[in-house]
Each structure stands twice: as C-alpha cells, then as structure tokens.
C-alpha cells in the first residue's frame, strides 16, 4: 500500500511539474491566486499533506507561496498564471482557486446613547453602573481586529489597571522591520499584533502592525478602548470616551494598506487569529457577494465560528440600494449603521437678524471671524456661461465663475446622483468662497467634509426660506455660526442612506442585516501626530470623527465581547441571538425607527433593530443555530456532500445533503429571524424554530411559561403552533412552528412583521419577511 502511494505521488509530481513548465513557455496572464482546500485536518495529516505537496511543487517550479493556511483551514496563496490556476483547481483536495481580490474598508457619545436605549427597555438593569458591569467580567476576553493596523500610543490602548495577559493567548507582537523596530510595543491591553504583505503591495514602510490610515485605530477604540476623560474633537463632542468592552484585550491583524485589503492577507489573518486564541473577530470591510467559496470573509469566518469564535462584520456602505449587503453568510453577525442623538449644530444667521436663524449642521473649525456676515449667493447665479445649469446649481467642478464665488457664502443644491459633498465644498473653497450651505435632506455624515472650511447642511424647506431671503434683498448677507455639539434633542436612531440594504443578493431565504448600531459621526481615537488629519492651522487631533458601517461593526463587537466574558460557554450563535432578540425598533421619542428620508425602516434596513447594551445580557430565550444548521445551509444553497465534507471536519457520521432540497429550505435553519422567499399565496409555508431557556437563576424564573404574540401586515396570515411554551428548567429546549398563508393570490410587496415570545419579564422578538420574489429576482 505504501509503495503504491509513493508511486502515485511521484507520478503526480512529475505530471504537475511538466505542466507547470509548459505553462511557463505559453503566453498566459498571471496574478495572485488563493487556493482553498477546506478544513485543516484534525490530526495534521492527510489534508495538510495535499497543501504541502502542492506548495512544494510550486517552489520547485520557482513559485513561492505568499501565505500558507494551516491552523483554521487549509490552503495557500501564490502568484500563478491562469493555466497554472486552472491546473491546480483540478487537483484532489482543492475546493476553489480564485483571484486574490482587494477588499475595501467600510469607512463617546454612541455608547452613552446605547445605555439610554437599554434603560428604556431593560428596567432590570437600570440600577447597574456601566463601568461596574464592564469590569466584572471582561479582562480575559480578546477581540481580534482584521484592519489597517493600530497606533499603540493612542490613549485608548493604555494598560492601566489591566491584569496579566490571559494564559489562553498564544499570539505574538510583531514589531516590524522598519529602521526603529522597537518603536512598536504591545502591553497588557494591546496584547498582540501582526502584519501581512502580499506580492501586490511590498513596501518597507508597511512591514509593521502600525496604522497609517487611522481606520484600525478608530474601530479598535470603539470596541475595546479604555475609558478616557475629556475626549473631544477640538472641543466638540467632549466628554468621557469609552469602548464597548473597555476591559477586553486587543489583538490587531494588519491586513490592509493604502490600496485596500488583500483577500490572501485576510485569510492569513483569520488563520492566525484562530490559532492565537481570540474570542471575537471584528471586520469592517467587505467584498461584493458572488460565490461563497471565493469570498475570503465567508471562508475565514466559517472556520472561526466552527471553533467558537464570534465574527462580527459591517454590512457595507452601498445603500440605500436594495440587495447591497456585504458579509451576509449566516454564521456572521452583519451590522448596519444607525444615528445617535448627538448633533453638530452650525446655524445660519440671515441678514444679521436673529429672528432669521436657519438651523443647520456641520463641523466647522475654520480660522475666520465666525461672527462676520458675508455676501450670500445661490450657485445658480455664479454659473459659467458654458456650464450646465443643473450641474452649476449642484456646485459641480468647473461649473462656477471664480470672480463671482470669491469672498461669498454659496448655497449649493444636492439633487444629482453621484455627487459627493466634499467635491462641492472643495470646489467652492478652490474658487475662493468663504463657505458653503448645502441643501440636502439625506446627508448625515460630516466626516468627509474639510472642517477648516465653513460648511453647513440644511433641509430643503429651509433652502426655500433662504432663497426667498436672497430674492427679497439687493445685498443678501449671512453668517455661519460656530459649531456646537448638542445631545438629546435629535430624533434617533435612524438609518443613514449609505448603510447597505437587504435582501441578500445570493439568497432571499436568510434575512440580512442582523442588527443596527451607531455609525454616523462617531468620536474615537486616532493616530498620534497625524498632520494630514489636522484642519488648517490646528494641531493634529488625538481623536477623530468618522462615519460608516465600519464604525457600527465594532459597537457590536464590543457587546459580543461583554457577552462572551459573562457567559464563556455561549456559542457565537447564542451571542448573536441575544443581541438580535433584545433589539429595539423605536426611537428616543417612542416613534418607529425611520430611514434618513423619513420612511419607516424595515428589517432590510436594520435587521432586528437597534442594538442595546444590557438587554443581550439577559435575553430569556436564545436561538441556537448549530453546526448542523450551517452544514444544511451549504447543502440547501447547492454544495454537494463531498464539498461540504471538505469544508468542515466536524461532519456527523452518515451525513448527506437533504434530498430534493433547494435554497428556499434555508428558511428552516434555526436563525433568530425568518425570511420566506418565492411565496405564491396559493399554499401555506411552514418553518420551525427551537429556543433554549437561558433565564437567570438569580431571578428564579427557571420554570416559566412564554406566550406568543404576532405582528403581521394586512393580507398575510401567520399562525404559531403551539402558542405557549412551558420551560421547566434552564437549558430546556422547545420547538414551535410558524405557518404563513395569504388572503390574496400574490403579495404585491414584501411583507414585514415579527413574532414575540413573552413571559412577563422577557420579550424575545424575531422579525420576519415574506416575499413572492425568488433568488433569480434581482433588484439591482
């Protein structure tokens, strides 16, 4: 037997090398490729032998693998020709070979706001101090960030009052290869750091875990930053800044550069994070969904979750278009963005008359006399002779006359697609304008506007009032007032337009996003001494204000870390369930959460709703989406039994894909939400769910009865069987069925609703969506 195996391997080596040599002599495009070979073998033998064989053969042909994956999964990345890639894809043990694509990053008060949201919902926890709750459990929880690196000297990452590094930590602190490698140091807070370079981007300056973009530093401080007093952005948003889990440890995996984040580096970071012993992985980036076996985040997160690591991802910044969600595999927690109740007021005084005050918002740190009045014009009146009037109204580049704009405040419209606010303000500034007033009812994100230039944003109805004033006087003047931050008076949360929307492009039978969290104008730590981030005439900031689902993701990562520290035995699915079923759907005024344009938000906008801090710590019941659910998902999605057995090494004996299944069956995995696709109304659809009692023994509610309530739209009939669930003890599991039917032949629109189980103390809510569309119905 051994002799036969040796002959087989020798023949394969000869054949492989001969074809590789032939590929060299033929004209073929080349590039970086990822070779994914499924799960890492439990005993380090067979599967890894395939990896070693292929990678060693490549080396013999002069091809050195950039990365080898061996801890959480098997595979490698290498520079190959197309022919070589096609050849390797046909070899035993290879699941997929795909180009090494570039992923893009999805780029204080937020935690105080979430605390208030929790208090409104969770009376049991209103007596508990936030800091005390944080310090009770979190010291041994490790959050791994796959991002642009970290600035270790930032105040958020000091290790005051931190205990010894947890014994479970198996990672390292790479100091880099720069001229002063000792300048990067870890501590008891920042316990580990790694960096990854690919053949695409080799730069000695980036051979370090240090952050040169600010993104990784910002998100890490949101999730796990220490408590910092008197934090502010040049006096704005001042107060105590803290991470969601300030006692958790941080491990940074710098997989991103100025150009983006290489998929091969992302997989290498996943592989190391799994081996290092992190509890939570936070990822604020994404790749457009196309194929689960060619998505580094779907692959890496599957193997991380398989080992009990919770993976939290941003939903993307491609909204408000439908089917624009990123990172929507069911083993991930997918996070949308929402607003908080803090606003940055920058009002406009018309004609020096205090009775003509227009409410605006913006962040202005300009070094000019903010009490002085300047001439006010609408951009239309500054149009170049040969410019398009609509483009000029919107302050598009090269459409305005500099001689007219110079020294004035310019009112710009915002009713053209693909018009970035910064382009408009940059154009007015370039032409010598004093400031810009933008008429826009959708823009909430102020982070991309140059704060050294006077900019304020107003609502369309206020724009009409300004135009009325301009037309009523021969010499209109205005003053843009100094910015001041105010909390508590803004309607919040709402869903900003940039946050990506469901349904999931690859299948409508899973509801994504899962949850929403603050992601607009978030204050957090920044690079120390970064002059590129400093407004004109100001010193570099210690903290910066950023927006995006990149900022939403670490809010949930911090909460996930809190839950893991409080309940070490909880699985990633239990943590996700607790976060989702305790979410809120109401604003701080008691109205339903809306989108940025004022429309009622749906689960396609915010999933289960807005995350709360304390609610997930006591959810009552949880939906345990187990490993078998994920294997069935792969089977329902279309993978074969042989493929699934390569993807996972935790396959039950006798496993086979369910016969005659399809993607519609994905609705039956034990997820905290329900999504029914291809609903024709002629016949009912039935799904089942199982819940586990995790009530607190301290309250004495182990023996408890939950009763269901249903919120369903007109035209959709929803029945739940049984309507009561009687749990005898903690850990009991009970199942129920949900039957959907319709009073009409076909649903005209997607139907949204919810199912809530309540025992008088806990409300366990699951959103649902029912649609007549199937996976072939694209809305893009």
Curated annotation (Swiss-Prot):
GO CC field: extracellular region
Peptidase S8 domain ranges (all copies): 110-617
Signal sequence residues: 1-25
Entry-listed glycosylation sites: 197, 230, 471, 776
Positions of the PA domain: 385-469
Enzyme Commission identifier(s): 3.4.21.-
Keywords: Autocatalytic cleavage, Glycoprotein, Hydrolase, Protease, Secreted, Serine protease, Signal, Zymogen
Family annotation (PANTHER family): PROPROTEIN CONVERTASE SUBTILISIN/KEXIN
The protein, known as: Subtilisin-like protease SBT5.1
Lineage start: Eukaryota, Viridiplantae, Streptophyta, Embryophyta, Tracheophyta
């Amino acid at each position: 037997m051994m002799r036969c195996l040796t002959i087989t391997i020798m023949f394969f080596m000869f054949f492989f090398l001969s074809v590789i040599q032939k590929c060299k002599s033929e004209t073929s495009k080349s590039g970086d490729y990822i070779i994914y070979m499924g799960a890492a073998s439990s005993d380090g033998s067979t599967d890894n032998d395939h990896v070693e064989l292929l990678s060693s053969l490549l080396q013999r042909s002069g091809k050195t693998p950039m990365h080898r994956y061996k801890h959480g999964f098997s595979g490698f990345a290498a520079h190959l020709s197309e022919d070589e890639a096609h050849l390797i894809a046909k070899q035993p043990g290879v699941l997929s070979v795909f180009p090494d694509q570039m992923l893009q990053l999805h780029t204080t008060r937020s935690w105080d706001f979430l605390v208030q949201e929790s208090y409104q919902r969770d009376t049991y926890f209103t007596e508990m101090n936030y800091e005390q709750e944080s310090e009770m459990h979190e010291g041994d929880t490790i959050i791994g960030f796959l991002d642009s690196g970290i600035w270790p000297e930032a105040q958020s990452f000091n290790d005051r009052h931190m205990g010894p590094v947890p014994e479970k930590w198996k990672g390292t602190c790479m100091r880099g290869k720069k001229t002063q490698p000792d300048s990067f140091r870890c501590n008891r807070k920042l316990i580990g750091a790694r960096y990854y370079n690919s053949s695409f981007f080799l730069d000695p300056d980036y051979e370090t875990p240090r952050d040169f973009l600010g993104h990784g530093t910002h998100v890490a401080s949101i999730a796990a930053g220490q408590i910092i007093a008197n934090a502010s952005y040049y006096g704005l948003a001042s107060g105590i800044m803290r991470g969601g889990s300030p006692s958790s440890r941080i491990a940074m995996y710098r997989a991103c550069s100025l150009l983006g984040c290489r998929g091969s580096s992302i997989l290498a970071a996943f592989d190391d994070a799994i081996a290092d012993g992190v509890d939570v992985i936070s990822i604020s980036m994404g790749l457009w969904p196309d194929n689960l076996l060619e998505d580094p985040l779907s692959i890496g997160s599957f193997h991380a979750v398989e080992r009990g690591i919770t993976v939290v991802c941003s939903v993307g910044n491609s909204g408000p278009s439908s089917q624009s969600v990123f990172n929507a595999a069911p083993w991930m927690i997918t996070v949308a963005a929402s607003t908080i109740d803090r606003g940055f007021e920058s009002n406009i005084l018309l004609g020096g008359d205090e009775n003509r005050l227009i409410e605006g918002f913006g962040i202005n740190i300009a070094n000019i006399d903010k009490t002085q009045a300047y001439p006010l014009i609408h951009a239309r009146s500054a149009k170049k002779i040969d410019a398009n009037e609509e483009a000029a109204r919107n302050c598009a580049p090269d459409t305005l006359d500099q001689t007219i704009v110079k020294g004035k405040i310019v009112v710009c419209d915002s009713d053209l697609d693909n018009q970035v606010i910064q382009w408009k303000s940059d154009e007015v500034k370039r032409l010598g304008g004093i400031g810009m007033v933008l008429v826009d009812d959708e823009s909430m994100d102020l982070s991309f506007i140059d704060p050294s230039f006077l900019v304020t944003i107003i609502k369309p109805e206020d724009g009409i009032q300004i135009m009325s004033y301009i037309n009523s006087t021969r010499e209109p003047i205005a003053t843009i007032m100094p910015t001041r931050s105010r909390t508590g008076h803004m309607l919040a949360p709402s869903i900003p337009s940039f946050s990506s929307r469901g349904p999931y492009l690859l299948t409508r039978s899973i509801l994504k996003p899962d949850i929403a969290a603050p992601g607009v104008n978030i204050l957090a730590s920044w690079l120390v001494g970064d002059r590129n981030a400093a407004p004109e005439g100001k010193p570099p900031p210690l903290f910066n204000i950023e927006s995006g689902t990149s900022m939403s993701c670490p809010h949930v990562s911090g909460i996930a870390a809190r839950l893991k520290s409080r309940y070490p035995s909880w699985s990633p699915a239990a943590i996700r369930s607790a976060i989702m079923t305790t979410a809120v759907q109401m604003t701080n005024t008691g109205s339903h959460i809306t989108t940025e344009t004022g429309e009622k938000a749906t689960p396609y906008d915010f999933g289960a709703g807005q995350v709360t801090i304390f609610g997930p710590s006591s959810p009552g019941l949880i939906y345990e989406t187990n490993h078998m659910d994920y294997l069935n998902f792969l089977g329902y999605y279309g993978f074969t039994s042989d493929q699934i057995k390569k993807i996972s090494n935790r396959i039950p004996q006798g496993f086979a894909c369910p016969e005659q299944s399809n993607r519609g069956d994905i609705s039956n995995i034990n997820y905290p939400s329900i999504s029914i696709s291809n609903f024709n109304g002629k016949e009912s659809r039935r799904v089942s769910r199982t819940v586990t009692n995790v009530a607190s023994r301290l309250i004495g509610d182990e023996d408890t009865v939950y009763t269901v309530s249903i919120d369903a739209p007109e035209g959709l009939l929803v029945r739940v069987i049984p309507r009561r669930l009687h749990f005898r003890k903690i850990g009991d599991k009970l199942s129920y069925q949900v039957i959907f039917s319709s009073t009409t032949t076909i649903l005209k629109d997607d139907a949204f609703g919810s199912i809530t189980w309540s025992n008088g103390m806990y409300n366990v809510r699951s959103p649902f969506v029912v649609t007549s569309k199937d996976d072939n119905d694209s809305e893009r």
